[in-house]
């Protein structure tokens, strides 16, 4: 069910599926086998094999990383690495020679570095780097990091395994598989990715919390850890499993060098400021370049010596039956054949004269150690055995075989005490062609590079540990320089989860040293002689150490640890891919939601805009129709009134005619002599009266017409105003509805967005829990394998002890019986029968003693097995507890994030509602203002209405004049 939910979370719709993309630096149309010829295999990384390839045209060598990619999404995981390599042209960064995607395989061709990785060099030489060598590496790494950080690139996987060496003594920073390329200068990342032992504290916190992202300062921390690794072969906390080391990094103080006294003050101060747990106060690469530890480095001679030593011709001798006092390391210098001589005392160590190198590089020599026991300055010899320094000048006899190495008590796997390393600084090579002992079996290694293990992946240095043994104070050298130089010799022990020391080792409580108990050494001694030339000086370095079964166990444990780290890195890569896919899906969901919100709002606005347009259009049409109707009514009314007035006027004319007839009739009734005069007078009076009446009548008709027209116009204007008011009211209601709908949509969108973000947060934490559970399952699987290995080793050791005990008892019994018989014979006490009886009693006692020894061994084995079972159960329970704490922390953080998200949403909703009130108020004020403006406009229109008083207005209705009445 959980897996189904996980698939649902990462599922994209059909139209969201990614199509094949063309990448700028990846060629799809060319078979890389047509351009490059595979000449060998360099190693096997976590994501693919690494081959040594040769360009068929130019003959240039390259390291070819071949990765099978099943989909475009997997291909995209490696594009960032290719783009970074293609855009970063720097002398200390590995160069990209080409990238091809052909037949389902991605070929990444990068610069071939014959020197190999620094961790592989340390494995080859069985020692860490000297301080001058570390200075040069640190200087070049800082310059590379300063360049990367300037391009907004975070490497995120700095370690010695990712620092490659060229034959010229320069480094090449490699493996950008988990690097991040930011788009902004201040951008931060929250991906939990990298190798645990080198992770910065802020990166570790991102496993369960994404609230505190990190920036390029994480590389500075990894740089400091890498310097400690180069000094001590292994990074800090290497004895812990990855689960524990993450907890250690997050909660412990910054790591330091195991033996600070053997390193310079500048080196210790550099590590102190680089390993600052607070990334805000941690310096940048540019600031660290000004530090005295690296600021005066001008030569890479130390690295040229290192590469020459690692690439030197090796002669191997295997000798049997060597005793501790016979083991030696000889470091001899031979002057070149030219006229150039050099004192042998100046060329006595693998560093080839560190004092001269420091002078050449303008770097001050670290303060020399006072003449003190070697235990203070040779704190890192072989983890497989004690280290002795012998030299005629030191006055130490080669027969001093009783030196024991005190071992600091800590939880680690049983240390192999069978290896011995000695440095012999007594002579120059008398003959370059001197052959070793003919009795020894010889094997010569070709002068070829180790597998370029970290051209793409860490193939060698991910699972090495530092011995951390010290010599007792009884050995005091005469020269502090030699004591300081020999401190860099070290071998490796396998990294382990932590268990008790081997039962075959006994602890000397007085000296704190370990010694073998109950058995003798019957191991072979491997003697290696390296010859190389640097700057005209031929150097020979001979190292000897005893080969034991623990060597094979160490190699096996290194391999298993590498496998575990590869498995974790594969999980990290898959987690990163899943997180990237989920982030892309979430971004797409938010983008689609915002587009949908915008479309919904635009659709709602458009709907109301259309409604308003329709309303305004209807209003306009209605007003126009009202105007037209008014015009028609006005004409009709005017016509009707004119007709009525015409009839009234005709009647009025008839009345005037009648009056005229009456006047004539009255005049005719007068005497004839008075008629003429009276007629003339009466007619004049009648004419004046007629004109006056006619004028008054016409004026009254005109006034009546104007009143009727004005009344009609007023009624029409009132109707239009009512219509305008009604339309404005409807428009304002639409505006209110529009704003209310938009406000409702805004609130709904706030709620919907909150629900989506909340669901996305749940999906993100579900994915984190899913990835965390997968990681925990892998860790439990690794722990079970480890416990099983420990149980099997214990069973094998017990079987060997059980099989060896009868032989020892028989031999011991014979010896004791012989000694007892001899004592009886010497004493001569008693007769032969008495002696036989005593011998019989002694034999019975021996049988009882041997039986008791067998019972004691059986009890011891049972106790060991019980303790081992308890230890395995304790390991599992402790791991389970740590995993439960992480899961609980993740769930608690999810709860806090969800609660904070809800609170933020409620606060946003409250702020939105608080802002809504003034928006409503502003809307109502705006609508009321428009109403007032409309009323004011109507009022002004009425006041500005013209009042026609001239007869010209009536002439529209009365085309005749008053003179037409006669």
From Swiss-Prot:
Region annotation Disordered: where it falls in the sequence: 341-497, 660-692, 826-865, 901-966
Stretches assigned to coiled coil: 588-936
Comp. bias regions, Polar residues: 341-363, 371-392, 438-456, 485-497, 950-966
Protein topology in the membrane: Peripheral membrane protein
Annotated Gene3D superfamilies: Phosphorylase Kinase, domain 1, Transferase(Phosphotransferase) domain 1
Catalytic activity: L-seryl-[protein] + ATP = O-phospho-L-seryl-[protein] + ADP + H(+); L-threonyl-[protein] + ATP = O-phospho-L-threonyl-[protein] + ADP + H(+)
Region (Activation segment): 175-224
Protein kinase domain sequence ranges: 36-294
Modification comment: Autophosphorylates following homodimerization, leading to activation of the protein.
GO CC term (a single one): plasma membrane
Annotated Basic and acidic residues bias: 421-430, 834-865, 901-946
Compartment annotation: Cell membrane
PANTHER family in alphabetical order: NON-SPECIFIC SERINE_THREONINE PROTEIN KINASE, PROTEIN KINASE DOMAIN-CONTAINING PROTEIN
Name this protein carries in UniProt: Serine/threonine-protein kinase 10
């Amino acid at each position: 069910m959980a897996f189904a939910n996980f698939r649902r979370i990462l599922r994209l719709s059909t139209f969201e599926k990614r199509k094949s993309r063309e990448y700028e630096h990846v060629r799809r149309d060319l078979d890389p086998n047509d351009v490059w010829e595979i000449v060998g295999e360099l190693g096997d990384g976590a994501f693919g094999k690494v081959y040594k390839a040769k360009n068929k045209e130019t003959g240039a060598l390259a390291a070819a990383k071949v990765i099978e990619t099943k989909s475009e999404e997997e291909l995209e995981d490696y594009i960032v690495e290719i783009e970074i390599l293609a855009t970063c042209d720097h002398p200390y960064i590995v160069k990209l020679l080409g990238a091809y995607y052909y037949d389902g395989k991605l070929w990444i061709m990068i610069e071939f570095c014959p020197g190999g990785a620094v961790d592989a060099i340390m494995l080859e030489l069985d020692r860490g780097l000297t301080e001058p060598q570390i200075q040069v590496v640190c200087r070049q790494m800082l310059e590379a990091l300063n360049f990367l950080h300037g391009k907004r690139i975070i490497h995120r996987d700095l370690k010695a395994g990712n620092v490659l060496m060229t034959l010229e003594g320069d480094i090449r920073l490699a493996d950008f598989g988990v690097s991040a390329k930011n788009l902004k200068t201040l951008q931060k990342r929250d991906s939990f990715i990298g190798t645990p032992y080198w992770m910065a504290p802020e990166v570790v916190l991102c496993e369960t919390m994404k609230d505190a992202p990190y920036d390029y300062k994480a590389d500075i921390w990894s740089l400091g850890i890498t310097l400690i690794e180069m000094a001590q072969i292994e990074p800090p906390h290497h004895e812990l499993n990855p689960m524990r080391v993450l907890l250690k990094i997050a909660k412990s103080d910054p790591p330091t060098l195991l033996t600070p006294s053997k390193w310079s003050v500048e080196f210790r101060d550099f590590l102190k400021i680089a390993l600052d747990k607070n990334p805000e106060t941690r310096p940048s690469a540019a600031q660290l370049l000004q530090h005295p530890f690296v600021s005066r480095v001008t030569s890479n001679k130390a690295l040229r010596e290192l590469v020459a030593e690692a690439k030197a011709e090796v002669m191997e001798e295997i000798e049997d039956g060597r005793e501790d006092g016979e083991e030696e390391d000889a470091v001899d210098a031979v002057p070149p054949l030219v006229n150039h001589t050099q004192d042998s005392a100046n060329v006595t160590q693998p560093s080839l004269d560190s004092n001269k190198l420091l002078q050449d590089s303008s770097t001050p020599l670290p303060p020399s150690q006072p003449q003190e026991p070697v235990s203070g300055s040779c704190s890192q010899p072989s983890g497989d055995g004690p280290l002795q320094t012998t030299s005629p000048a030191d006055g130490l006899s080669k027969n001093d075989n009783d030196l024991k190495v005190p071992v600091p008590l800590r939880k680690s796997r049983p240390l192999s005490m069978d290896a011995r390393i000695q440095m012999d600084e007594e002579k120059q090579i008398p003959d370059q062609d001197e052959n070793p002992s003919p009795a020894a079996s010889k094997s010569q290694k070709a002068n070829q590079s180790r597998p370029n293990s970290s051209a793409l992946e860490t193939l060698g240095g991910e699972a090495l540990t530092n011995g951390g043994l010290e010599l007792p104070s009884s050995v005091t050298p005469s020269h502090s320089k030699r004591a300081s130089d020999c401190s860099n010799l070290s071998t490796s022990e396998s990294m382990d989860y932590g268990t008790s020391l081997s039962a075959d080792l006994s602890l000397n409580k007085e000296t704190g040293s370990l010694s073998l108990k109950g058995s003798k050494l019957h191991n072979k001694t491997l003697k290696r002689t390296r010859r190389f030339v640097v700057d005209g000086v031929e150097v020979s370095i001979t190292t000897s150490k005893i080969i034991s079964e623990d060597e094979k166990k160490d190699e096996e444990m290194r391999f298993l640890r590498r496998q575990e780290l590869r498995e974790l890195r594969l999980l990290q890569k898959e987690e990163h891919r899943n997180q990237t896919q989920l982030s892309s899906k979430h971004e797409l969901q938010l983008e689609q939601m915002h587009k949908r919100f915008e479309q919904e709002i635009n659709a709602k606005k458009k709907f109301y805009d259309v409604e308003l347009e329709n309303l305004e259009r209807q209003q306009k049409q209605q007003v126009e129709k009202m105007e037209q109707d008014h015009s028609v009514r006005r004409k009709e009314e005017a016509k009707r009134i004119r007709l009525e007035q015409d009839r009234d006027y005709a009647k009025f004319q008839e009345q005037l005619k009648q009056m005229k007839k009456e006047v004539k009739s009255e005049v005719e009734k007068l005497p004839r002599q008075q008629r003429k005069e009276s007629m003339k007078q009466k007619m004049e009076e009648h004419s004046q009266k007629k004109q006056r009446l006619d004028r008054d009548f016409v004026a009254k008709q005109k006034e009546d017409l104007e009143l009727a027209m004005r009344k009609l116009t007023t009624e029409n204007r009132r109707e239009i105003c009512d219509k305008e008011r009604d339309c404005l009211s409807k428009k304002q209601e639409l505006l209110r509805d529009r704003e209310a709908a938009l406000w409702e949509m805004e609130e709904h969108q706030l709620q919907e967005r909150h629900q989506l973000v909340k669901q996305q947060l749940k999906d993100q934490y579900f994915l984190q829990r899913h990835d965390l559970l997968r990681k925990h399952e892998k860790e439990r699987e690794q722990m079970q394998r480890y416990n099983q290995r420990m149980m099997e080793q214990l069973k094998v050791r017990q079987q060997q002890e059980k099989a060896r005990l009868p032989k020892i008892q028989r031999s011991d019994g014979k010896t004791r019986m012989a000694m007892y018989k001899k004592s009886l014979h010497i004493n001569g006490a008693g007769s032969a029968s008495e002696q036989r009886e005593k011998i019989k009693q002694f034999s019975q006692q021996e049988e009882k003693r041997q039986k008791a020894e067998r019972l004691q061994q059986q009890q011891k084995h049972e106790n060991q097995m019980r303790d081992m079972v308890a230890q395995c159960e304790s390991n599992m329970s402790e791991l389970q507890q740590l995993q439960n704490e992480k899961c609980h922390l993740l769930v608690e953080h999810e709860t806090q994030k969800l609660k904070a998200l809800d609170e933020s949403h409620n606060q946003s909703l409250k702020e939105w509602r608080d802002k809504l009130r003034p928006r409503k108020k502003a809307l109502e004020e705006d609508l009321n203002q428009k109403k007032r403006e409309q009323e004011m406009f109507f009022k002004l229109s009425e006041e500005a209405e013209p009042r026609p008083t001239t007869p010209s207005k009536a002439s529209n209705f009365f085309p005749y004049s008053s003179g037409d009445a006669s």
